[in-house]
């Protein structure tokens, strides 16, 4: 019988048994070659049915940075995941506009990242899982203590027939079985309708969704459905037909499968430059959740960018609802500085040049009023003031301002216009225009000149590698230092701790402890292959003249040496050392480790550069010694 629609306040027609959406179990896959000819660009066809917008009652954002986002790049470290998760929470705000995020659950690193994010106790985004449609994966979700997980339920015949080697009925039976098993485990299932924009919508997807809604009614659990535009085929044109029309896809699930819009989620890809507009269109036609990643990073061409959805959300709603847009810039800076990801300079909202204009007529407009050529108050909304264009009229003050703005220098780090490097850059610019130049100086040109004339502002690639290696060593070193056994200064207790350290981190060539007089107190803790090389370097060896001993003794702080060539192994190394303190915080000794550069740096040019530095330092030291300097 007809059902009451509380939103539209009328009775919805219910089809008789002669006109119901039931599974069409075909013998051959329907690959819809008339729309998706593999040797040609796919077609965009129209049925000329225009659907009015019917926005979801509530719209929000979900995230897949730590799942889909990691399929496009080297995996994030555990700490990077924790840091990004915290920033994501700040960005989405107290109302949870960024409502959920999903994690892989397979590796120890994945599990550790989930645990560390859970320990933060943040309400949003809620942490959910992602598993295959396999019963053996369900315990992973339970072990992680998660309330919800996504499951891969591919819906196109490309996947069902060609990838899974199943029929539609077999796939449906398999999917419903895993959903029931997840429900039995007390977990909320989120079915990922993979490759939906190439699927038979009324021959498989809607019948599948109807069965899921039956399970929802029986179990009382809100089973969710993610509409996955896996290949980015979705289009937003009025009158575009299924399966590519985003509006018709969303309404089919709501109107014909009786799926509440709050349980629908759009997951898109950017293969045809439509990831963002497809996601926001799904919002406008009743889908509550739009799935995304930070900076749009995802498999192949990526996903809708969170920062883009954030700005679009505010534009559609007319208010922020607790969103902190300035965090967008914090996230971008983290990607650039910590993850060392190069963001394209013209990337919206976060690229180096997104609010920079170079055309002379535009520059004139900006001088008269910032609003003429700036999209909004980028200083207030994104902490990104307009960066001035540099010409021969900028002068030293303008160049200094550009450098400080572009590189985010503040306080004591700022560059003054009297810096000698500024004068050299200013002269180069003047010479350019003297020779007939009429365009503004590009960001790339200025960066190159700043690197040339003000190198102290930059770490070299080699220094950055050393810094990262030392940073990793320091984190482990401090764990060792804090071990109660180390504080005792009793070698028989310290040595087992140090040996475990060496075995866990093979780049550590040698670990040792010296007392306050610089005398070595521990036996040779090294890899077995190097043990014989340290035969004459036993307990009692005097190290009091070594930099790694003197500096921590003087400052009470951790110290990292320059590169050197080990006299024991001939390997290129650097040393990290730190004071050992007792329970009264009194210094009782120094703990040091020698780290092999070759194990950390694979690029031969960097090893060669570091070797030259080490050899020069060795020569200089010998020269001073020979000349009593």
Curated annotation (Swiss-Prot):
What does this protein's UniProt record list under function?
A: Catalyzes the condensation of the acetyl group of acetyl-CoA with oxaloacetate to form citrate.
Pfam families with a match to the protein in the record: HMGL-like, MCP-like_PDC_1
Name the Gene3D superfamilies for this protein: Aldolase class I, PAS domain
Which cofactors is this protein said to need? Answer: Co(2+); Mn(2+)
Write down what this protein is called: Citrate (Re)-synthase
CDD domains documented for this protein: DRE_TIM_Re_CS, PDC1_HK_sensor
Q: What's the source species for this entry?
A: Syntrophus aciditrophicus (strain SB)
Cache domain segment(s): 497-601
């Amino acid at each position: 019988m007809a059902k009451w629609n509380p939103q539209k306040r009328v009775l919805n027609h219910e089809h008789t048994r002669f006109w119901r959406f039931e599974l069409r179990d075909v013998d051959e896959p329907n690959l819809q070659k008339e729309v998706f000819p593999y040797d040609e660009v796919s077609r965009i066809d129209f049925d000329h049915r225009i659907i009015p917008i019917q926005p979801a009652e509530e719209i929000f954002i979900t995230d897949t940075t730590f799942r889909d986002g990691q399929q496009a790049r080297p995996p994030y470290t555990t700490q990077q995941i924790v840091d990004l998760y915290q920033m994501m929470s700040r960005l989405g705000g107290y109302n949870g506009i960024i409502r959920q995020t999903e994690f892989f659950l397979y590796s120890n690193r994945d599990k550790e990242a989930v645990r560390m994010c859970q320990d933060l106790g943040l309400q949003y985004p809620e942490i959910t899982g992602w598993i295959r449609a396999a019963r053996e994966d369900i315990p992973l979700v339970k072990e992680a203590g998660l309330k919800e997980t996504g499951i891969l339920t591919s819906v196109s015949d490309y996947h069902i027939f060609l990838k899974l080697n199943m029929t539609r009925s077999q796939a449906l039976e398999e999917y419903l079985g895993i959903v029931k098993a997840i429900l039995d485990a007390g977990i909320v299932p989120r079915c990922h309708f993979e490759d939906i924009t190439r699927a038979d919508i009324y021959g498989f997807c809607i019948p599948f969704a109807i069965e899921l809604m039956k399970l929802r009614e029986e179990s009382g659990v809100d089973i969710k459905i993610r509409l996955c535009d896996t290949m980015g085929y979705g289009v937003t044109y009025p009158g575009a037909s299924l399966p590519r029309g985003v509006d018709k896809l969303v309404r089919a699930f709501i109107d014909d499968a009786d799926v509440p819009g709050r349980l629908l989620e759009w997951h898109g890809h950017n293969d045809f430059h439509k990831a963002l507009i497809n996601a926001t269109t799904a919002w406008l036609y009743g889908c509550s959740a739009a799935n995304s990643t930070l900076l749009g990073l995802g498999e192949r061409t990526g996903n809708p960018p969170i920062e883009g959805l954030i700005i679009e959300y505010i534009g559609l709603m007319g208010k922020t609802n607790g969103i902190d847009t300035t965090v967008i810039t914090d996230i971008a800076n983290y990607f650039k500085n910590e993850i060392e990801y190069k963001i394209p300079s013209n990337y919206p909202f976060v690229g180096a040049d997104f609010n920079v204009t170079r055309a002379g007529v535009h520059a004139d407009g900006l001088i008269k009023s910032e609003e003429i050529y700036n999209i909004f108050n980028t200083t207030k909304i994104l902490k990104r003031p307009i960066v001035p264009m540099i010409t021969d009229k900028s002068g030293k003050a303008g160049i200094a301002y550009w450098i400080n703005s572009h590189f985010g220098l503040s306080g004591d780090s700022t560059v003054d216009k009297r810096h000698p490097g500024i004068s050299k850059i200013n002269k180069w610019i003047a010479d350019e225009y003297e020779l007939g130049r009429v365009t503004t100086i590009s960001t790339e040109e200025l960066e190159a000149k700043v690197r040339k004339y003000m190198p102290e502002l930059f770490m070299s690639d080699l220094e950055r590698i050393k810094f990262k290696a030392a940073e990793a060593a320091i984190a482990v070193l401090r764990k060792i230092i804090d071990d109660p056994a180390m504080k005792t200064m009793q070698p028989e207790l310290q040595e087992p701790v140090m040996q475990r350290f060496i075995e866990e981190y093979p780049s550590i060539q040698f670990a040792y402890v010296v007392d306050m007089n610089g005398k070595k107190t521990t036996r040779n803790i090294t890899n077995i292959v190097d043990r014989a090389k340290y035969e004459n370097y036993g307990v009692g060896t005097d190290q009091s003249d070594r930099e790694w001993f003197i500096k921590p003794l003087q400052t009470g702080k951790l110290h990292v040496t320059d590169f050197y060539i080990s006299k024991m192994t001939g390997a290129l190394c650097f040393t990290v050392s730190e004071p050992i303190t007792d329970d009264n915080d009194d210094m009782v000794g120094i703990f040091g480790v020698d780290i092999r550069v070759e194990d950390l740096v694979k690029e031969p040019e960097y090893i060669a550069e570091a070797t030259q530095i080490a050899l020069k330092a060795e020569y200089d030291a010998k020269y001073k010694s020979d000349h009593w300097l």
